[in-house]
From Swiss-Prot:
Designated gene of the protein: Tex26
Region (Mn 2): 69-83
Designated name of the protein: Testis-expressed protein 26
Ranges for region Mn 3: 140-153
Region (Mn 4): 175-189
Mn 1: region residues: 30-42
Region Mn 5, annotated ranges: 229-243
Organism name: Mus musculus
Amino acid sequence: MARYRNKVSCPAQCDPKLQSTGDTSWDSYATTMKTAFTPKRGMVPDLIRPKSTRRLGFTYSIGDPILNESQYHDEYTWKLRSKENMVKTGTSRGVWNHKTHPGQEFFQWTHPKGKQTQKLPWIEPPSEESIQNAVASQFISCTKRDFVDLTQSKKTMKRFPRSQDRKSLLPRPLDTEFRYNYQIPAQIPELKDFSFKYGCYASLPVASQGLVPSVLSSYIRNEERTKKQTTYECDYGKACLDFLTILDSFTPSQVHDYLQSVSYKDRQILERFIHSHCDIEAKPNKREKQSHRKRP
Protein backbone atom coordinates (compact mmCIF):
# COMPACT_ATOMS: atom_id res chain seq x y z
CA MET A 1 0.00 0.00 0.00
CA ALA A 2 2.91 2.31 0.73
CA ARG A 3 4.24 1.83 -2.81
CA TYR A 4 0.98 2.93 -4.38
CA ARG A 5 0.82 5.93 -2.11
CA ASN A 6 4.22 7.16 -3.27
CA LYS A 7 3.36 6.74 -6.95
CA VAL A 8 0.16 8.80 -6.75
CA SER A 9 1.06 12.38 -7.70
CA CYS A 10 -0.57 15.52 -6.32
CA PRO A 11 -2.89 17.36 -8.75
CA ALA A 12 -1.14 20.64 -7.93
CA GLN A 13 2.17 19.27 -9.32
CA CYS A 14 0.64 18.13 -12.62
CA ASP A 15 -1.45 21.21 -13.45
CA PRO A 16 0.56 24.45 -13.38
CA LYS A 17 -2.67 26.46 -12.92
CA LEU A 18 -3.42 24.71 -9.66
CA GLN A 19 0.07 25.25 -8.20
CA SER A 20 0.18 27.33 -5.05
CA THR A 21 1.11 30.96 -5.51
CA GLY A 22 2.24 31.43 -1.95
CA ASP A 23 -1.05 33.02 -0.86
CA THR A 24 -1.99 31.59 2.49
CA SER A 25 -5.46 33.22 2.46
CA TRP A 26 -6.73 30.90 -0.24
CA ASP A 27 -10.41 30.03 0.13
CA SER A 28 -11.27 26.49 -0.91
CA TYR A 29 -14.97 27.44 -1.21
CA ALA A 30 -14.39 30.45 -3.42
CA THR A 31 -16.80 30.73 -6.33
CA THR A 32 -16.06 31.73 -9.89
CA MET A 33 -17.63 35.11 -9.20
CA LYS A 34 -15.07 35.83 -6.50
CA THR A 35 -12.08 34.58 -8.49
CA ALA A 36 -12.98 36.19 -11.82
CA PHE A 37 -14.33 39.51 -10.49
CA THR A 38 -11.92 40.49 -7.77
CA PRO A 39 -12.61 43.60 -5.71
CA LYS A 40 -10.77 46.72 -6.80
CA ARG A 41 -8.04 47.95 -4.51
CA GLY A 42 -6.23 51.22 -4.42
CA MET A 43 -7.22 54.83 -4.92
CA VAL A 44 -9.90 55.50 -7.52
CA PRO A 45 -9.15 58.63 -9.60
CA ASP A 46 -11.66 61.46 -9.48
CA LEU A 47 -14.09 61.61 -12.34
CA ILE A 48 -13.29 64.45 -14.73
CA ARG A 49 -16.30 66.15 -16.20
CA PRO A 50 -15.79 66.84 -19.92
CA LYS A 51 -16.25 70.47 -20.87
CA SER A 52 -16.97 69.89 -24.55
CA THR A 53 -20.47 68.39 -24.16
CA ARG A 54 -23.50 70.26 -22.86
CA ARG A 55 -25.45 67.19 -21.78
CA LEU A 56 -23.20 66.31 -18.88
CA GLY A 57 -23.08 69.77 -17.39
CA PHE A 58 -21.84 73.30 -17.80
CA THR A 59 -18.42 74.42 -19.01
CA TYR A 60 -17.44 75.86 -15.62
CA SER A 61 -16.12 73.86 -12.72
CA ILE A 62 -17.43 73.78 -9.19
CA GLY A 63 -14.72 76.05 -7.83
CA ASP A 64 -15.26 78.82 -10.42
CA PRO A 65 -17.17 81.97 -9.42
CA ILE A 66 -20.90 81.76 -10.20
CA LEU A 67 -21.92 84.39 -12.73
CA ASN A 68 -25.47 85.45 -13.61
CA GLU A 69 -25.71 82.68 -16.17
CA SER A 70 -27.63 79.42 -16.19
CA GLN A 71 -28.55 76.75 -18.67
CA TYR A 72 -31.86 78.51 -19.40
CA HIS A 73 -29.99 81.81 -19.87
CA ASP A 74 -27.45 80.10 -22.09
CA GLU A 75 -30.03 78.43 -24.36
CA TYR A 76 -33.09 80.72 -24.45
CA THR A 77 -31.75 84.27 -24.19
CA TRP A 78 -31.35 86.67 -27.09
CA LYS A 79 -27.92 86.40 -28.63
CA LEU A 80 -26.07 88.62 -31.01
CA ARG A 81 -25.96 87.62 -34.61
CA SER A 82 -22.83 85.67 -35.38
CA LYS A 83 -20.62 87.07 -38.08
CA GLU A 84 -20.88 85.08 -41.24
CA ASN A 85 -17.72 83.91 -42.84
CA MET A 86 -17.12 85.91 -45.94
CA VAL A 87 -16.52 84.03 -49.16
CA LYS A 88 -12.83 83.87 -49.83
CA THR A 89 -11.74 83.79 -53.41
CA GLY A 90 -8.42 82.22 -52.56
CA THR A 91 -7.78 78.51 -52.78
CA SER A 92 -6.10 76.20 -50.35
CA ARG A 93 -2.76 76.83 -52.05
CA GLY A 94 -2.96 80.56 -51.48
CA VAL A 95 -3.37 81.45 -55.19
CA TRP A 96 -6.03 84.14 -55.71
CA ASN A 97 -8.50 83.44 -58.47
CA HIS A 98 -10.25 86.58 -59.73
CA LYS A 99 -12.71 84.65 -61.93
CA THR A 100 -15.17 83.81 -59.18
CA HIS A 101 -18.78 82.74 -59.73
CA PRO A 102 -20.80 84.04 -56.77
CA GLY A 103 -24.32 82.79 -56.10
CA GLN A 104 -27.60 84.35 -57.15
CA GLU A 105 -28.02 86.12 -53.83
CA PHE A 106 -25.18 88.48 -54.83
CA PHE A 107 -27.04 89.71 -57.94
CA GLN A 108 -29.21 92.84 -57.65
CA TRP A 109 -32.35 92.53 -59.76
CA THR A 110 -33.49 95.62 -61.67
CA HIS A 111 -36.23 96.38 -64.22
CA PRO A 112 -35.28 96.44 -67.88
CA LYS A 113 -34.49 99.76 -69.48
CA GLY A 114 -37.37 101.77 -70.93
CA LYS A 115 -40.05 100.23 -68.67
CA GLN A 116 -41.86 102.64 -66.37
CA THR A 117 -42.22 101.60 -62.78
CA GLN A 118 -45.81 101.61 -61.47
CA LYS A 119 -46.65 102.68 -57.97
CA LEU A 120 -47.98 99.99 -55.71
CA PRO A 121 -51.60 100.42 -54.50
CA TRP A 122 -50.74 100.25 -50.79
CA ILE A 123 -48.21 103.05 -51.22
CA GLU A 124 -50.84 105.52 -52.56
CA PRO A 125 -52.41 107.76 -49.89
CA PRO A 126 -56.06 106.84 -49.07
CA SER A 127 -58.92 109.15 -49.98
CA GLU A 128 -61.17 110.96 -47.49
CA GLU A 129 -64.17 108.74 -48.25
CA SER A 130 -62.24 105.56 -47.52
CA ILE A 131 -61.03 107.06 -44.24
CA GLN A 132 -64.59 108.02 -43.21
CA ASN A 133 -65.91 104.55 -44.07
CA ALA A 134 -63.13 102.90 -42.09
CA VAL A 135 -63.85 105.08 -39.04
CA ALA A 136 -67.63 104.57 -39.31
CA SER A 137 -67.31 100.79 -39.58
CA GLN A 138 -65.60 100.71 -36.19
CA PHE A 139 -68.77 101.99 -34.48
CA ILE A 140 -71.20 99.41 -35.96
CA SER A 141 -72.92 97.47 -33.19
CA CYS A 142 -72.92 93.70 -32.99
CA THR A 143 -76.70 93.52 -33.49
CA LYS A 144 -76.52 95.59 -36.66
CA ARG A 145 -73.68 93.45 -37.98
CA ASP A 146 -75.21 90.07 -37.03
CA PHE A 147 -78.97 90.73 -37.37
CA VAL A 148 -80.04 92.22 -40.68
CA ASP A 149 -82.94 94.68 -40.88
CA LEU A 150 -86.40 93.08 -41.35
CA THR A 151 -87.16 95.07 -44.46
CA GLN A 152 -83.96 93.87 -46.05
CA SER A 153 -84.57 90.28 -45.00
CA LYS A 154 -88.10 90.33 -46.48
CA LYS A 155 -86.71 91.48 -49.79
CA THR A 156 -84.24 88.61 -49.82
CA MET A 157 -86.98 86.11 -48.87
CA LYS A 158 -89.22 87.22 -51.73
CA ARG A 159 -86.54 86.36 -54.22
CA PHE A 160 -86.58 82.67 -53.32
CA PRO A 161 -89.71 80.50 -53.86
CA ARG A 162 -91.33 79.61 -50.55
CA SER A 163 -91.78 75.87 -49.96
CA GLN A 164 -95.21 74.78 -48.71
CA ASP A 165 -95.21 73.50 -45.15
CA ARG A 166 -97.26 70.31 -44.98
CA LYS A 167 -97.74 70.54 -41.23
CA SER A 168 -99.63 73.81 -41.59
CA LEU A 169 -102.11 72.12 -43.95
CA LEU A 170 -103.09 69.51 -41.34
CA PRO A 171 -106.37 70.20 -39.48
CA ARG A 172 -105.77 71.27 -35.91
CA PRO A 173 -108.39 71.10 -33.14
CA LEU A 174 -109.45 74.33 -31.46
CA ASP A 175 -109.11 72.80 -27.99
CA THR A 176 -105.88 72.90 -26.08
CA GLU A 177 -103.51 69.96 -25.99
CA PHE A 178 -104.68 68.96 -22.50
CA ARG A 179 -108.36 69.03 -23.48
CA TYR A 180 -107.65 67.17 -26.70
CA ASN A 181 -105.74 64.35 -24.98
CA TYR A 182 -107.73 64.14 -21.72
CA GLN A 183 -111.27 64.64 -22.98
CA ILE A 184 -114.36 62.63 -21.96
CA PRO A 185 -114.22 59.21 -23.64
CA ALA A 186 -116.85 58.37 -26.20
CA GLN A 187 -119.63 56.32 -24.59
CA ILE A 188 -121.21 53.42 -26.46
CA PRO A 189 -125.03 53.44 -26.10
CA GLU A 190 -125.15 49.65 -26.03
CA LEU A 191 -123.13 49.58 -22.81
CA LYS A 192 -125.61 51.90 -21.07
CA ASP A 193 -128.24 49.13 -20.93
CA PHE A 194 -128.29 47.99 -17.28
CA SER A 195 -131.15 45.51 -17.71
CA PHE A 196 -129.00 42.70 -16.31
CA LYS A 197 -127.63 42.55 -12.77
CA TYR A 198 -124.58 40.33 -12.95
CA GLY A 199 -120.90 40.89 -12.21
CA CYS A 200 -120.06 44.54 -11.58
CA TYR A 201 -123.70 45.57 -12.19
CA ALA A 202 -125.06 43.41 -9.34
CA SER A 203 -124.93 46.28 -6.81
CA LEU A 204 -126.68 48.87 -9.00
CA PRO A 205 -129.93 50.29 -7.61
CA VAL A 206 -131.58 50.11 -11.05
CA ALA A 207 -134.22 47.38 -11.41
CA SER A 208 -133.38 44.62 -13.85
CA GLN A 209 -135.42 44.19 -17.01
CA GLY A 210 -136.03 41.32 -19.35
CA LEU A 211 -135.62 37.60 -18.68
CA VAL A 212 -134.19 36.51 -15.34
CA PRO A 213 -132.75 32.98 -14.94
CA SER A 214 -134.20 30.52 -12.44
CA VAL A 215 -132.94 30.64 -8.88
CA LEU A 216 -130.13 28.19 -8.23
CA SER A 217 -129.26 26.45 -5.00
CA SER A 218 -126.01 28.37 -4.81
CA TYR A 219 -127.95 31.65 -4.70
CA ILE A 220 -130.08 30.37 -1.83
CA ARG A 221 -126.99 29.22 0.04
CA ASN A 222 -125.38 32.59 -0.38
CA GLU A 223 -128.47 34.36 0.93
CA GLU A 224 -128.57 32.11 3.98
CA ARG A 225 -124.94 32.87 4.74
CA THR A 226 -125.55 36.59 4.49
CA LYS A 227 -128.25 36.35 7.19
CA LYS A 228 -125.73 35.08 9.74
CA GLN A 229 -124.16 37.71 11.92
CA THR A 230 -120.75 36.14 12.41
CA THR A 231 -118.53 33.62 10.68
CA TYR A 232 -118.80 31.28 13.68
CA GLU A 233 -122.59 31.14 13.35
CA CYS A 234 -122.27 30.57 9.61
CA ASP A 235 -119.91 27.61 10.07
CA TYR A 236 -120.90 26.08 13.43
CA GLY A 237 -124.41 27.43 14.12
CA LYS A 238 -127.66 25.40 13.75
CA ALA A 239 -131.10 26.30 12.47
CA CYS A 240 -132.87 25.63 15.84
CA LEU A 241 -131.83 25.43 19.48
CA ASP A 242 -131.48 21.98 21.02
CA PHE A 243 -133.42 22.29 24.29
CA LEU A 244 -132.75 18.70 25.25
CA THR A 245 -129.04 19.35 25.54
CA ILE A 246 -129.83 22.39 27.68
CA LEU A 247 -132.02 20.32 30.06
CA ASP A 248 -129.42 17.61 30.35
CA SER A 249 -126.90 20.19 31.47
CA PHE A 250 -128.99 21.09 34.56
CA THR A 251 -129.54 18.98 37.68
CA PRO A 252 -133.12 18.09 38.89
CA SER A 253 -132.83 20.44 41.87
CA GLN A 254 -131.88 23.34 39.60
CA VAL A 255 -134.86 22.59 37.33
CA HIS A 256 -137.22 22.44 40.33
CA ASP A 257 -136.01 25.79 41.68
CA TYR A 258 -136.44 27.36 38.26
CA LEU A 259 -140.04 26.10 37.96
CA GLN A 260 -140.94 27.60 41.34
CA SER A 261 -139.74 31.03 40.22
CA VAL A 262 -141.81 31.03 37.01
CA SER A 263 -145.51 31.91 36.64
CA TYR A 264 -148.20 29.24 36.72
CA LYS A 265 -148.81 29.19 32.94
CA ASP A 266 -145.13 29.01 32.08
CA ARG A 267 -144.68 26.30 34.67
CA GLN A 268 -147.39 24.11 33.07
CA ILE A 269 -145.81 24.51 29.63
CA LEU A 270 -142.37 23.67 30.93
CA GLU A 271 -143.63 20.66 32.93
CA ARG A 272 -145.32 19.25 29.82
CA PHE A 273 -142.09 19.65 27.87
CA ILE A 274 -140.05 18.04 30.63
CA HIS A 275 -142.46 15.10 30.98
CA SER A 276 -142.37 14.54 27.23
CA HIS A 277 -138.59 14.60 27.37
CA CYS A 278 -138.62 12.09 30.21
CA ASP A 279 -140.99 9.80 28.30
CA ILE A 280 -138.69 9.85 25.28
CA GLU A 281 -135.76 8.76 27.43
CA ALA A 282 -137.83 6.15 29.34
CA LYS A 283 -139.09 4.31 26.25
CA PRO A 284 -135.64 3.27 24.93
CA ASN A 285 -134.65 2.18 28.45
CA LYS A 286 -137.71 -0.15 28.70
CA ARG A 287 -136.92 -1.66 25.32
CA GLU A 288 -133.35 -2.39 26.40
CA LYS A 289 -134.59 -4.14 29.61
CA GLN A 290 -137.02 -6.35 27.67
CA SER A 291 -134.28 -7.38 25.24
CA HIS A 292 -132.03 -8.36 28.13
CA ARG A 293 -134.77 -10.50 29.71
CA LYS A 294 -135.48 -12.43 26.49
CA ARG A 295 -131.83 -13.34 25.84
CA PRO A 296 -131.29 -15.66 28.89
